[in-house]
Amino acid sequence: MMNFAVLPGVDINIFLLIFIGLGAGILSGFAGVGGAFVVTPALIILGLPSNLAVGTALAWVTGNSIVAVLRHRKLGNVDTKLGLILAVAAISGMEVGVRILNWATNMGLADEVVLSISICMLIIVGTYTLLECSRRKRQLDKMLEKEERLPSAMSATSLSQKLQAINIPPMLHFAKSGVTMSPWIMSAVGFFVGTLAGVIGVGGGFIMVPSLVYLIGIPSFIAVGTDLFQIIFSASYGCIRHAMSGNVLILVAFTMLAASCYKHQDSIRKDNHSTH
């Protein structure tokens, strides 16, 4: 068995880490998320304390996002201006999240806090996504019944339209995303996602992508690339802060990263082949 001791009394099979890295890399490529919402629980199941699982997952997602965003930038799916605004806000939230996790660790509540917040957020995001998909399906069915022409895109939700109508200066136009909105609203979204990311050890993609689509109202393919772009900055900061607290196992993160990077490089080669 290819096991190595990551902690006293904790041995992890290297093939399990490779499998986790490959699986998370595939999810990252398809859904535009960092993949750490899979990595963090998996590391906890393998026996790592929650604080180490969180820090190590952020180290992995930093490298994974750098490789993934290269592909999306090549495809033109990155709104740089929006991504930088989200990144600055997410970094501020990340600091708050790291402090919350350190407090929970000192109180002996890290496992309960990380797992309970992760489960709650997955339920909330999943439920809202299903409700919104159902609403759009009903809207399309009505248009088909009336034989109306279907729109080429339906990115704007009722909630995103209300948020875009809030006039808090300065109002910025994001040409790539096709929206005009106050950066303060976007910063609030970034701060909230960054705080959660710092606590539960994710890049925030599984929350950020639905937020960009349903709250901000940008196309899903732009949301995917832009989220991966901002994750590079926010996850890097979170990784450094967790490393300062001794919460990062670099060998574990590197093993998973090698597997996920191989998957991303395979996708890039397919993209290059399809464009020639």
Regions found by a protein language model. Give the residues of each.
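Alpha-helical transmembrane segments of multipass membrane proteins
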Residues: 25-26, 42-45, 69-70, 194-195, ...
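Interfacial segments of multi-pass membrane proteins
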Residues: 39-52, 207-222
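Membrane-interface helix-cap regions at the ends of transmembrane helices
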Residues: 64-75, 233-249
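Transmembrane alpha-helical segments of multi-pass membrane transport proteins and ion-pumping complexes
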Residues: 21, 25-33, 37, 64-69, ...
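Juxtamembrane transmembrane-helix termini in multi-pass membrane transport proteins
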Residues: 36-83
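Short hydrophobic/aromatic, small-residue-rich stretches within specific transmembrane helices
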Residues: 57-61, 227-231, 253-257
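Juxtamembrane transmembrane-helix boundary motif
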Residues: 1-20, 74-192, 214, 244-276
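Alpha-helical transmembrane segments of multi-pass membrane proteins
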Residues: 17-21, 59-62, 189, 229
